[in-house]
Amino acid sequence: MFARAVLKLLAAVLALECTGCVLHLQRDLEPPPGFHYEPPPGATQPFDSFERTPVELSQPFDETRNHEIMRFEFRSSGRNGHPDNLVEGQYFRSKAPGKKSLVVVMPIWGTSSYPPAKISTGYARRAGDDTHVMWIYGNAPVFPWTELSSVPTEEGFRALAQDSAERYRSAVVDMRRLVDWATMQPEIDASRIAFVGFSMSALVTATLLANEPRVSAGVLMMGAARFSEIFSRCRNRAGEVREHVLRTFGWTPSEYHDFFESLFAPADPVRFEGRYDPNRILMIDAMFDDCMPESARAALWEITGHPQRVTFLYQHRSAFYSLTPLGLNVSRRKIYRFLDKVLGRDAAAGD
């Protein structure tokens, strides 16, 4: 009996250790002193102007009980890295009549499609016919890390980095164009449009929220502010780029920081303090993030007025396990509940 009890205790301890990725802190605090929110009157340069563009929808290629599933595409406003300069994705369009809310799920460009696929299909299933979902594909990277970390000349590096800044600008403007199209569709409730961003697309979503007043809410998972700090301190692929530039071209860390500050300051959330409604934002980050510095994550939280913030006790990539059964789907459930709340689905939502 005693031996069996000890084995059960050991099993329980091991189970707890194996679910470390779901250990997290949650903050629900008042806005910082002096914080004042005013809805953004419009977009600022270089995100302020664009031409309306049609979004082309395919015939449905699949369906669920509540949604038709079709592909969509439209031409990018700039150079977005796609071979044909297109924005592509899937549209889970509700079969029910009447105006429904819209959730746009952003990609992790050039890397894993699991997080956006999981949230897109999962929330469409959860919301039923009360919500449309659009999943943006991310096959073309905003930052071509392999090329950036191996380009042989300083001139070539500067050109690639400037092209990446243009891809970022295009991503923000293209999502503004998508929102513009969505507000004119008879099946979409223009007052209930939310975005979900992960890592790099969390940065884009943060810029978008400050420049597109028709986006009513956003999820920022593994994002931050102070973009030049991210480039200066992120490890992973971005760290390989930094090491290459400092070693090959003889740049100092300060020169590297200032170069990316000049490129990305127009998009940085620090520029848009007061344009974020903390009641309409969910921030998810990782305490031991090895890409987004703690100071940059704290800055985003301050600038956005102390929105609901969930901090997982993990590093950058491993925090995404919280979207999976390995992480007990903790962040997935938190995202769903947040969307239910801001889109007015509380009464009808399950877990």
Language model: regions and residue ranges:
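Short beta-strand element of the alpha/beta-hydrolase
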Residues: E88-G89, K99-I108
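Short beta-strand/loop motif that positions the catalytic acidic residue
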Residues: Y276-D277, L282-D285
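C-terminal catalytic histidine-bearing segment of alpha/beta-hydrolase fold enzymes
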Residues: A298-D351
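Hydrolase active-site cap/lid region
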Residues: T207-E255, T311
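Gly/Ser-rich "nucleophile elbow"/oxyanion-hole loop immediately N-terminal to the catalytic nucleophile
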Residues: F157-S199
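N-terminal cap/lid segment of alpha/beta-hydrolase-fold proteins
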Residues: F50-A96
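Short alpha-helix in the alpha/beta-hydrolase fold that links the catalytic acid
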Residues: A117-I119, N279, M292-E302
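Cap/lid segment of the alpha/beta-hydrolase catalytic domain
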Residues: T111-V173
